[in-house]
Swiss-Prot record:
PANTHER family: METHIONINE SULFOXIDE REDUCTASE, METHIONINE-R-SULFOXIDE REDUCTASE B1. It comes from the Bacteria. The gene is msrB. Zn(2+) binds at C62, C65, C111, C114. Pfam families: SelR. It is an enzyme of class 1 (oxidoreductase). HAMAP family: MsrB. SUPFAM superfamilies: Mss4-like. Residues 1-11 have a biased composition (Basic and acidic residues). It catalyses: L-methionyl-[protein] + [thioredoxin]-disulfide + H2O = L-methionyl-(R)-S-oxide-[protein] + [thioredoxin]-dithiol. This is Peptide methionine sulfoxide reductase MsrB. It comes from Vibrio parahaemolyticus serotype O3:K6 (strain RIMD 2210633). Residues 1-25 are annotated as: Disordered. Residues 23-145 form the MsrB domain.
Length: 147
């Protein structure tokens, strides 16, 4: 069983900008699957996400509000079935919450700007940080670098 990252639950507004919309507004903006995962804390099936095997250079941003969350330099293949990163873009990008669902104790990660569910963070990552940010592909959009 993966070790759980014990981070102090926090809410940090990214660049002082917080995105707030009603469920109705989110439903108009997002696909059914995006809404289920991002707004209702769902999970996409493992090995099904379009960004799982993406190896291009760029920034992974929030599907809901386009806030930058992760960079390609921090992405790695953990074998878990979801895109994995060893660190977020910065400490202000992510909100951490205790998740007691499904009979487990985990640390949920959300976008700090719009509170979108991203996935979970575990302490079984690579030696660089020891952390694995396990993220649903549907929670992310990829912005390719011009390089």
């Amino acid at each position: 069983m993966p070790k759980i990252v014990k981070k102090e639950p926090k809410f940090v507004e990214q660049s002082g900008k917080k995105v707030t919309k009603s469920d109705e507004q989110w439903r108009e903006q997002l696909s059914d699957e995006e809404f289920r995962v991002c707004r209702e804390q769902g999970t996409e099936p493992p090995f099904s996400g379009k960004l799982l095997h993406n190896k291009e250079t760029g920034v992974y941003a929030c599907t809901c509000c386009n806030a930058p969350l992760f960079i390609s330099d921090n992405k790695y293949d953990s074998g878990c079935g979801w895109p994995s990163f060893d660190a977020p873009l910065n400490n202000e990008a992510i909100r951490y919450l205790e998740d007691l669902s499904h009979g487990m104790v985990r640390t949920e990660i959300r976008c700090a700007s719009c509170d979108s569910h991203l996935g979970h963070v575990f302490e079984d990552g690579p030696k660089t940080t020891g952390e694995r940010y396990c993220v649903n592909s549907v929670s992310l959009i990829f912005n390719k670098s011009d390089e």
